[in-house]
């Protein structure tokens, strides 16, 4: 499939970028709508999006380049070439969450409440963005005989982009359904991190283009940390909420 959607003023506009932009815009609109429901200023959500999205993209690229340094050390000019892909979601999440945290501290806003609001549309944005990997012919798995395998370079392989897209969409539905009944501030983002990490850990094991640190697949390492951290955060925040209720 052609990676180029169309050409504008002599510049090729890539499907990868279009799908990512659509996901980000939709995710931001969902967050703004959720902000109205929970009493958060829409301007603050928009400001966080304006800050966190570019910071997240830069961090996603840095993460990808660092763990592909053997290639980029020989091709320095490609470090700033975003158009062909090469963004790591874990780097983007870390950068985006950190940017949002700093903003809430400066503005004296409840970080966990804001995080629950902003993260709601994130898995849907990811589900859409993963189709950019399909168009680029990347982020696929190894050979398979399963009927839903896709052909890449004459070999039928696991469509891991599809597995993750479906998983991400499922997470979005889960968050959408239970957010109104959450037990504590931060439960939505903790649930997102935990569920995404579980799915990514297993899906990553099928991929053939994993970012490596020695013998370790970095996405699996980060995902394992995400699961453990999510469980610890859930226990801590649940206990903290119960203590606050008791004191009241």
UniProtKB/Swiss-Prot annotation:
<keyword id="KW-0812">Transmembrane</keyword>
<feature type="transmembrane region" description="Helical">
    <location>
        <begin position="84"/>
        <end position="104"/>
    </location>
</feature>
<keyword id="KW-1003">Cell membrane</keyword>
<keyword id="KW-0808">Transferase</keyword>
<dbReference type="GO" id="GO:0008961">
    <property type="term" value="F:phosphatidylglycerol-prolipoprotein diacylglyceryl transferase activity"/>
</dbReference>
<feature type="binding site">
    <location>
        <position position="130"/>
    </location>
    <ligand>
        <name>a 1,2-diacyl-sn-glycero-3-phospho-(1'-sn-glycerol)</name>
    </ligand>
</feature>
<feature type="transmembrane region" description="Helical">
    <location>
        <begin position="6"/>
        <end position="26"/>
    </location>
</feature>
<dbReference type="InterPro" id="IPR001640">
    <property type="entry name" value="Lgt"/>
</dbReference>
<feature type="transmembrane region" description="Helical">
    <location>
        <begin position="218"/>
        <end position="238"/>
    </location>
</feature>
<comment type="pathway">
    <text>Protein modification; lipoprotein biosynthesis (diacylglyceryl transfer).</text>
</comment>
<keyword id="KW-0472">Membrane</keyword>
<keyword id="KW-1133">Transmembrane helix</keyword>
<dbReference type="GO" id="GO:0005886">
    <property type="term" value="C:plasma membrane"/>
</dbReference>
<protein>
    <recommendedName>
        <fullName>Phosphatidylglycerol--prolipoprotein diacylglyceryl transferase</fullName>
        <ecNumber>2.5.1.145</ecNumber>
    </recommendedName>
</protein>
<comment type="similarity">
    <text>Belongs to the Lgt family.</text>
</comment>
<dbReference type="GO" id="GO:0042158">
    <property type="term" value="P:lipoprotein biosynthetic process"/>
</dbReference>
<feature type="transmembrane region" description="Helical">
    <location>
        <begin position="47"/>
        <end position="67"/>
    </location>
</feature>
<feature type="transmembrane region" description="Helical">
    <location>
        <begin position="186"/>
        <end position="206"/>
    </location>
</feature>
<comment type="function">
    <text>Catalyzes the transfer of the diacylglyceryl group from phosphatidylglycerol to the sulfhydryl group of the N-terminal cysteine of a prolipoprotein, the first step in the formation of mature lipoproteins.</text>
</comment>
<dbReference type="Pfam" id="PF01790">
    <property type="entry name" value="LGT"/>
</dbReference>
């Amino acid at each position: 499939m052609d990676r180029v959607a169309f050409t504008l003023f002599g510049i090729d506009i890539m499907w990868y970028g279009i799908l990512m932009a659509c996901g980000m815009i939709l995710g931001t609109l969902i967050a703004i709508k959720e902000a109205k429901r929970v009493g958060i200023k829409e301007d603050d959500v928009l400001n966080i999006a304006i800050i966190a999205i570019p910071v997240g993209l830069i961090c996603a690229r840095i993460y990808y380049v660092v763990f592909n340094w053997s290639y980029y050390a020989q091709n320095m000019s490609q470090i700033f070439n975003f158009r062909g892909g090469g963004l790591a979601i874990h780097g983007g999440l870390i950068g985006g969450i950190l940017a949002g945290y700093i903003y809430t501290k400066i503005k004296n806003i409840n970080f966990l409440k804001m995080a629950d609001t902003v993260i709601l549309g994130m898995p849907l944005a990811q589900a859409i963005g993963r189709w950019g990997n399909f168009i680029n012919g990347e982020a696929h798995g190894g050979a398979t005989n399963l009927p839903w395998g896709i052909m890449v370079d004459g070999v039928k392989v696991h469509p891991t982009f599809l597995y993750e897209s479906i998983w991400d969409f499922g997470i979005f539905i889960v968050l959408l359904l239970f957010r109104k009944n959450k037990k504590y501030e931060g439960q939505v983002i903790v649930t997102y991190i935990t569920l995404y990490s579980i799915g990514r850990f297993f899906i990553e094991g099928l991929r053939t283009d994993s970012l490596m640190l020695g013998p370790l697949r970095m996405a699996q390492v980060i995902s394992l940390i995400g699961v453990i951290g999510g469980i610890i955060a859930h226990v801590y925040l649940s206990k903290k909420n119960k203590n606050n209720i008791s004191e009241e």
